Amino acid sequence: MASLRIAPLALFFFLAASVMFTVEKTEAGIPCGESCVFIPCITAAIGCSCKSKVCYRNHVIAAEAKTMDDHHLLCQSHEDCITKGTGNFCAPFPDQDIKYGWCFRAESEGFLLKDHLKMSITN
């Protein structure tokens, strides 16, 4: 009798897992999975950003952009990132069809080199 009660629950979990893994493999326009109305994207660590109050993958945002002003992290050169104040490095996507890059900060190596050079001059 207990197995009859558990069977519908097991079927529900199986169907939910099937849908979840099917959606995870498609990257086109599917959002990363959460809304960013009140809080930022939780999935930012795996490459998601907020656009129109929904979290999308970064390469999807860049591929669908008509201009650089569609998202604050889109760029075509390092100067664009510095001008917008969103970083100092414009990284292009591996896909050649995407004409915009993504801004991020890349300062740690520069600071280490600058500190090393300063140390070697004073000694």
From Swiss-Prot:
Q: Name one Pfam family in it.
A: Albumin_I_a
KW Nucleotide-binding (keyword) present: no
Checking InterPro entries in the record gives:
Albumin_I_a, Cyclotide, Cyclotide_bracelet_CS, Cyclotide_sf
Q: Where is this cross-link: Cyclopeptide (Gly-Asn)?
A: 29-58
Which UniProt keywords are given for this protein, alphabetically ordered?
Answer: Antibiotic, Antimicrobial, Cytolysis, Disulfide bond, Hemolysis, Knottin, Plant defense, Signal
Query: Using the chain's own numbering, where are the disulfide bonds?
Result: 32-48, 36-50, 41-55
Kindly give the PROSITE patterns that the UniProt entry links to this protein. CYCLOTIDE, CYCLOTIDE_BRACELET
Residues spanning the signal sequence: 1-28
Spell out the residue numbers of the propeptide: 59-123
Q: In which tissues is it expressed?
A: Expressed in flower, stem, shoot, root, leaf, seed, pod and nodule (at protein level).
Q: Where are the transmembrane segments?
A: none
GO BP annotations listed: defense response to bacterium; killing of cells of another organism
Biological role stated in the UniProt entry: Probably participates in a plant defense mechanism. Active against Gram-negative bacteria E.coli ATCC 700926 (MIC=1.0 uM), K.pneumoniae ATTC 13883 (MIC=5.5 uM) and P.aeruginosa ATCC 39018 (MIC=7.5 uM). Has hemolytic and cytotoxic activity.
Q: Which family does it belong to?
A: Belongs to the cyclotide family. Bracelet subfamily.
Q: Write the protein's name.
A: Cliotide T4
Species, as recorded: Clitoria ternatea
- Give the lineage: Eukaryota, Viridiplantae, Streptophyta, Embryophyta, Tracheophyta
